[in-house]
Swiss-Prot record:
PANTHER family: 2-C-METHYL-D-ERYTHRITOL 2,4-CYCLODIPHOSPHATE SYNTHASE, CHLOROPLASTIC. Coiled coil: none annotated. Homotrimer. Its cofactor is a divalent metal cation. 4-CDP-2-C-methyl-D-erythritol 2-phosphate binds at residues 8-10, 34-35, 56-58, 61-65, 132-135, 139, 142. Binds 1 divalent metal cation per subunit. The keyword Lyase applies. Keywords: Isoprene biosynthesis, Lyase, Metal-binding. CDD domains: MECDP_synthase. The gene is ispF. It comes from Finegoldia magna (strain ATCC 29328 / DSM 20472 / WAL 2508). Pathway: Isoprenoid biosynthesis; isopentenyl diphosphate biosynthesis via DXP pathway; isopentenyl diphosphate from 1-deoxy-D-xylulose 5-phosphate: step 4/6. The keyword Nucleotide-binding does not apply. InterPro entries: MECDP_synthase, MECDP_synthase_CS, MECDP_synthase_sf. This is 2-C-methyl-D-erythritol 2,4-cyclodiphosphate synthase.
Length: 159
C-alpha cells in the first residue's frame, strides 16, 4: 500500500470556463492555467504521482510544452492511470476537498466522482469529492481562486 497527497491552486479569471472534476460548472469566471486548470484533477494526479514517487504533474506534463496547452485534464489523468497501472498499482481510494466560496458545487459532485472513477478504472465508491468554503476568509473567500486537496491510497495489484 502507498499513500499520496496532492494540492493544487488556480486563480479565477474572466473569459475562462470553470472545469472541476471534468465537469463544466456555470460561473462568471474560470480557472487560469496552461491546461484547462482543473484543480481537482490536478490535485488527484499529484496525489497519485506522490504515492508512486514520480514527482509532481509539472514534471510529467510541463507547462513549457505546448502539447499540453489547454488540454483536457481528464486526458492527463488517464495518462497517470496508465503509468500507475504499468507500475502494478490500482486505486484503493481517493479523498478530495475543493475549497471555494462560489459557486456552490453540491449538484456537480456526483458527476465529478463518476468522471474520475471512469478515468481511473475504479468504482465511484472509491472516489470521494467534497466541497467547502473558507467562510469568506483568504483568497478563496474573496473569490480570487480555488484550491483542491487530495489524498490517495494505492494498492499493489494482485497478479
Amino acid at each position: 500500500m502507498r499513500i499520496g497527497f496532492g494540492l493544487d491552486v488556480h486563480k479565477l479569471v474572466e473569459n475562462r470556463k470553470l472545469i472541476l472534476g471534468g465537469v463544466e460548472i456555470p460561473h462568471d469566471k474560470g480557472l487560469l492555467g496552461h491546461s484547462d486548470a482543473d484543480v481537482l484533477i490536478h490535485a488527484i494526479m499529484d496525489a497519485i504521482c506522490g504515492a508512486l514517487c514520480l514527482g509532481d504533474i509539472g514534471k510529467l506534463f510541463p507547462d513549457t510544452d505546448m502539447k499540453y496547452k489547454d488540454i483536457d485534464s481528464r486526458v492527463l489523468l488517464r495518462k497517470v492511470f496508465e503509468i500507475m497501472d504499468d507500475m502494478g498499482y490500482e486505486i484503493g481510494n481517493i479523498d478530495s476537498t475543493i475549497s471555494c466560496q462560489k459557486p456552490k458545487l453540491r449538484d456537480y459532485i456526483d458527476k465529478m466522482r463518476e468522471n474520475i472513477a471512469q478515468d481511473l478504472h475504479t468504482n465511484t465508491f472509491n472516489i470521494s469529492v467534497k466541497a467547502t468554503t473558507t467562510e469568506q476568509l483568504g483568497f478563496e473567500g474573496r473569490c480570487e481562486g480555488i484550491t483542491a486537496n487530495s489524498v490517495c491510497i494505492l494498492n499493489k495489484k494482485d497478479l
